[in-house]
């Protein structure tokens, strides 16, 4: 590990987490609001939207190619006025341009030069089109530069005036139909203005833009006497950091006050706010108070007692009471008005303080650049020291620059860093004004922590500095200290050259070192490798480089590089050794990447460090030569030095660590409180210089926790001086790049970092977290309250404040502390089990139980250290061993004892897994472990008071809570919880119905399910929220009652073993806001975080205002006694209406109004028919209700009560108030369809929903699970209404409507139950009507009894569940909603006709194959009964077939198909002409056709399985011509077709379809002389065509043996004959293929591709001699040969005895073509 040199210059340390903190931390020179082109580096092309695509084209600066960063990380395209987004619901083509208020993912962020969004998608370029890809390596840059797209990110523009309390602009914002990406001007506003929400028309939130202005016009007031301009933002309430950024963005700063006159001017303003922020802060680690504009803090007007003595809970920002002019430190997160300030004249000439001058001084005095210094050895009070210096011809030291500070800390001191030395700074005034005793102007202040602390109303006050640190402190002038005198010396060289430096021109001296600039731009390391060791050296180099400020920005190489590309930067190796960093000065967002080399910038970021390419980047050089001995490195701790008792370390580390967690401290703390806590112990929050330190540190922490923790570390960017860069609180320089995608986000004003301890301790057995470590470090809001870790150098002495309770080693050694348990290990005395139990009890503890793997690991380790791995120890059995609920999924070695009935347990470090699973002898004498449940506290009392939590920034207050809307991609519960922690909050807890209503009112535009803070195991009782509050209110979805959920748990994912709660956002469903639960490892939206506030603030809800706006409606709250009719009249007088409540969001918002006012209000609901039906007074249809459960509806008018429910009340009684409203577009009077039914009033708190001529009630009552049969459901429907039936669905529109209703419950239920029954061998509805419309998922159900359930799923398909499997049936029912339906039209007569088996029509009889078949199977089944698949030839026949299909209810095959390979040439399978087209356009692929119940003719693949087919049998048959069969034709093989003679050839027509290749092979198989048919003349063409028509099957296409040669493009027959006859069809229709077919229907030929399509095959063979005679002759000869052989054998056997043969005679049969062989005669 490298050394950590603590120098006064180490204050500028930065760690870059690559946090894109847009707008709140970057330097003010980054405008970030300019438009730019997006260039792909590989192609040089720019992207722009074109139609529905984003394309790459040649770059230009036209509006069509310009983009801008706008709010919420969106990329806005200027011309299209849309944002680049990702539609995650699509697997492909998901990158599109969307409206900027779309719900799709619109955010984009940068990583190096790539652009990424959710789910690891990155912007890519393929084939000229921009796409989103997860493996993209595309590099994107801003046009005309080498900048990353995020190098100048979007900056917030804050506002004033208006009605947004100073909130920043939201870009783009919508006014009318135009999206504006910048502030706009119009006659209605006094200056350029913007909306602070997306939709100005909707929200009407706006403010005047605060942008840079030249001079003091507009929003500024000028004071020439003081020389400054001021901006008083009296109505704008922001946090200190937001106010600072608002001023910075205008080229100004927060108010600084430097004189009593300026203070009087500010306090004299009559219209100024009472409390305002000023720029005073102490946010820079280990430094004191300073102005944010870096002017000297010499004038003070602290409130008495502020700042107090150093406190742990001190606040680091200051505000001013403008009535008294007094200043007080407060929490930086408070929301307050603010004042900005900028100078009238900004041309300040800075003195030259860094140029070296040879100086002559008296003996004993230190010469330095024209002055002489003397550090006195004697001590004395300030006045005596002042007189002594005067006597020496000088004065007490005055310090005017960092060059002077450098003299103090590097030249005058070499001893104790805490030595205090008098300076010449003193105050004798009230209010305080510090002045130098030598009369020079105060141009610099360098205060120590919590300084300047000036006693109230006591003067004089004198200032000392602290030895080696050089920082200043206010002291009593009577205190005796050493002092430094200063006087002018004699400059001995006017030329300002120095003999120690080389004689070459350009060398400059600083201390004992010489420097020179080389102005040629070269790669890294060409000239030299510059090292920078302190802030003073950096300031000197800045002085050398400042002449380049006005030229084009230049860079200067340093010697800093990451040679190993591991993200660890060090100075270039000298002598083979890397030199560790002792100082860092990174620029904003740096170091940006590993593996680079570091250069210093010029311009506005003069001297800041940036990572550049070592090879390709060119920069100037500064070389450095030492003219004296190199300063020795400061001593660092040794790895073997000890740690304080109770502190921990790891090998080779130089620090000790201690965790302070809630179980051992009074409370969790903010970052500043935690850092001050550590400082009080002589420590700091942790810092890291190397990657392995992070890894080891995490390992150390994980051994102490069994649950996830976030812990503060020392990383922060709080100070304005850091300009958005990061530093360690202990001044350790930042040398490490931590690169992870999670870090590359802007976290607004999250200026402090925390580290997460992984909770999956057992998982680490297999997974080492090294590759995942970066996910455990995140920026947080600094006011978040977390546990923390302190770090102290090894060998240091721990400071012990009186409130601290340090670890003490007891008689049994130090304890082991895990979470909230404290374990003591008792080696002696050794006792039996019962004695060990008693011993622990006598010491206020218990025999230890082990319930987590973290505890097991720690206890095993301690046992092994104390007594070796074999020794057994007593522990106690536990009824709930380690995570017992998933032990069944673990191997043996991860199990704990199952012998829970046996109390005595012992374990050893080595064999614990076996020890805990076997019986032990309780009389054994063993050591044992005791456990204290109340772990020893590390604090005797709280030394500080907790800072008050307020609802700041975008936090929305409600009662004692603050809520924050968050946008994120879907995350697990723990990820959601962690993100809320980074904001300083938790996931929401819902403690009352009023909180539930408030949260519902925030749900519009959020996702359909969002995490809330409930987490439990399946074996736990849900009792607490994750914020620790008790579960006193619940709102689980009623469908969860009585339902058994099956939630998968995975061994490898511990989070999946927990259940977590979701809040459902079901849009306009009355169940919006109810809760569901699921596995915690699932991914859902994080939309809300909460934190508790100590101030109940209802400002955004304007509870005292009569008029409130919500969503698109304007409401007026009338707070006076009124009758219902009086309320109606009162609203009309206001040109408004008595409110109608049409959705759950309005209901929740108005419920909150009633709750906050504790008042019931009249609403516009009343009944005109004695409480039978209720309706809204403005005619809005009643489809949403929120009746109280116990409301009996005894009166005709309705109130919204204080509990948020609707209740009836007497219309003539006075109620405390009423709510009027003026509806916006969304809630204006609904236009009900003419055919929409008028439905009854809501039943059982659920409304009847109208659609077409029916009303529907979707039952969600808690007792609905008690019904399961359809008869029981029908009975339940009858109770709701006498005409109600269980749900039936008549058409597609109704099906879609029911699906839309079901989607409101889609996270709870999967089906709506359908009233389908089975009677008379068919399915029908419960009301005995036919299923005229169906949408079964798996096609025609194969049910033959009534033992099933049917349901409509969320995707619109119908599912059927047989009773065969009980678990599946129960699951189906428990995930179904019951629905009742009232049909206002009697469908029974219309829907009652069933489909007969045979249907005669004109010249045919039709029937339906009611079976799932392919097209070819349907064709075969029709053919087997002498039928054909149906064909259509006119509209009348089409309507007839459509009626059959509609009555059957399923899509059916017809006889239409295409086999040409292009799905274009369709033919009827019965051979009839395709003379009528039954569809308007071909909308689907496929080569066969079905007809569906909607009358749609669809193309489908012939091999796909459908629900049946239509066959027909003609009543009139055609007579077929006969063909002669000749014996001169080949014999028929197997089941082949008969050969037919025509002329001197034979022809065989195959029934099957074949490709051309198959056709050639087939003919060869039939006869070796056969070929695919060739045609010589017109007559043969007619014969073949007629043959195919008479033997028709599927198609008229016939392969011809005619093909085209590739070489000469000539055509030839396969049998080698010349082509003497052709009959090509019309050239315009003919193809360009190299094969040919005959179309038998019109007897023409067509060119086709040889490899595409199918056709029939006709084989042709020449007519030969009598084939049958030849066969007989061959057979006879064969027999004779056999006989001859037999005779020869017999002759040989019988010694050549001879027997004669009779003659053989051939005879002709009756048929001359036949050859007969009747018999053999002896």
Swiss-Prot record:
Residue span, Fibronectin type-II domain: 164-211
Phosphoserine carried by residues: 1703, 1719
Gene transcribed to yield this protein: LY75
Main location: membrane
Function of the protein: Acts as an endocytic receptor to direct captured antigens from the extracellular space to a specialized antigen-processing compartment. Causes reduced proliferation of B lymphocytes.
Cytoplasmic topological domain residue ranges: 1692-1722
Repeat as UniProt keyword: yes
GO CC terms, sorted: membrane
Full protein name: Lymphocyte antigen 75
Extracellular topological domain residue ranges: 28-1666
Keyword Flavoprotein: no
Positions annotated with a glycan in the UniProt record: 135, 345, 377, 529, 843, 865, 934, 1076, 1225, 1320, 1392, 1593, 1626
Subcellular location per the Swiss-Prot or TrEMBL entry: Membrane
